[in-house]
């Protein structure tokens, strides 16, 4: 009798465990992307300006256009002035009723005083949304001691993938806290969701983005400020080296629109429904399967780059 009760109890626990994960996965996939309606971003932001870093290409540029479409003035920040000027012109041609400003900034090797100067410019306007998008990847996946560019490249990737989200958030929050309103979105990567051989620095820096965003949401969420970590998989951008779209690979415009619609519904999500499906499946796989898949992906990326450059990668 005792054995029967024990077996029944274990069975019930297993069923509840499976049911819990099924409900969690279903809500993570369908909640932000199907069930929930987009919130009033202007009301939650509490101000009319949106700042976007890494705004002249890919996801950052698409965020800038989508925010302009939704009526925000846009302050774009990137390294190259000519590209900033061109992006500003493009935005105003489509959305002439908003204002666009820009600031040139090299995120790879800034001093604290450089950040203070940038923040002084940004804080001239009332910022309701901050999109910390700027980021960097290596030329191709590689073991730490073999990374192309050596410790200089390693330092650049570490700095650019961690400091901007941290320091710009710290410098703009003093605007948002008194208003009890504001939105800060930090763009990470699905690469931060698993430990990845040959992606060690990139994966670790993207995990940092996810982690600090979660910490800051707990610090400031009760004050009316939204923090969100977006962890996309493959998006058809120049940085990804893949201009072709597919069911699992949206273009950056489609992605940015989808990701903005999840604000207020998920503090950490991939930003796109098929990416969320990939993410939830990834979490169910054993490590050895993930490791094998990552190894194959890394080899394919190196092979593709070698083919483009007509030389082997050692």
Curated annotation (Swiss-Prot):
Catalytic residue positions: 202
GO CC terms of this entry: endoplasmic reticulum
Family per record: Belongs to the short-chain dehydrogenases/reductases (SDR) family. 17-beta-HSD 3 subfamily.
GO biological process: fatty acid elongation; steroid biosynthetic process
Enzyme Commission (EC) number: 1.1.1.-
Protein name: Putative steroid dehydrogenase 1
Pfam families according to UniProt: adh_short
Positions annotated to bind NADP(+): 47-76
Keyword Lipid metabolism: yes
Keyword vocabulary terms for this entry: Lipid biosynthesis, Lipid metabolism, NADP, Oxidoreductase, Steroid biosynthesis
GO molecular function, one term: oxidoreductase activity
Class of enzymatic activity (EC top level): oxidoreductase
Record-linked InterPro entries: NAD(P)-bd_dom_sf, Sc_DH/Rdtase_CS, SDR_fam
Matching PANTHER family: STEROID DEHYDROGENASE 1-RELATED, VERY-LONG-CHAIN 3-OXOOACYL-COA REDUCTASE
SUPFAM superfamilies named among the record's database cross-references: NAD(P)-binding Rossmann-fold domains
């Amino acid at each position: 009798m005792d054995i029967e009760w024990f077996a029944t109890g274990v069975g019930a626990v297993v069923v509840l465990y499976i049911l819990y994960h099924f409900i969690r996965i279903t809500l993570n996939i369908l909640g932000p992307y199907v069930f929930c309606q987009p919130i009033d971003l202007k009301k939650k932001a509490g101000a009319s300006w949106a700042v976007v870093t890494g705004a002249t290409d890919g996801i950052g540029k698409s965020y800038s256009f989508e925010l302009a479409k939704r009526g925000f003035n846009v302050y774009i920040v990137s390294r190259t002035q000519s590209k900033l000027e061109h992006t500003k012109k493009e935005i105003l041609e489509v959305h002439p009723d908003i204002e666009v400003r820009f600031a040139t900034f090299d995120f790879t090797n800034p001093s604290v005083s450089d950040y203070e100067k940038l923040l002084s410019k940004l804080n001239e306007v009332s910022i309701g949304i901050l999109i910390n998008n700027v980021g960097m990847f290596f030329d191709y996946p590689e073991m730490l001691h073999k990374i192309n560019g050596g410790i200089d490249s390693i330092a650049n990737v570490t700095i650019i993938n961690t400091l901007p989200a941290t320091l710009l958030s710290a410098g703009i929050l003093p605007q948002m806290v008194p208003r009890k309103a504001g939105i800060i979105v930090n763009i990470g990567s699905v690469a931060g969701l698993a430990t990845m051989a040959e992606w060690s620095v990139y994966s670790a820096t993207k995990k940092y983005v996810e982690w600090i965003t979660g910490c800051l949401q707990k610090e400031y969420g009760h004050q009316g400020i939204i923090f969100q970590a977006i962890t996309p998989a493959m998006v058809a951008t120049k940085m990804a080296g893949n201009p072709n779209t597919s069911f699992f690979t949206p273009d950056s415009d489609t992605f940015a629109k989808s990701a903005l619609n999840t604000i207020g519904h998920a503090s950490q999500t991939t930003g796109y429904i098929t990416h969320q499906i990939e993410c939830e499946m990834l979490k169910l796989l054993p490590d050895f399967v993930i490791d094998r898949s990552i190894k194959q992906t890394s080899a394919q990326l190196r092979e593709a780059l070698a083919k483009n450059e007509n030389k082997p990668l050692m």
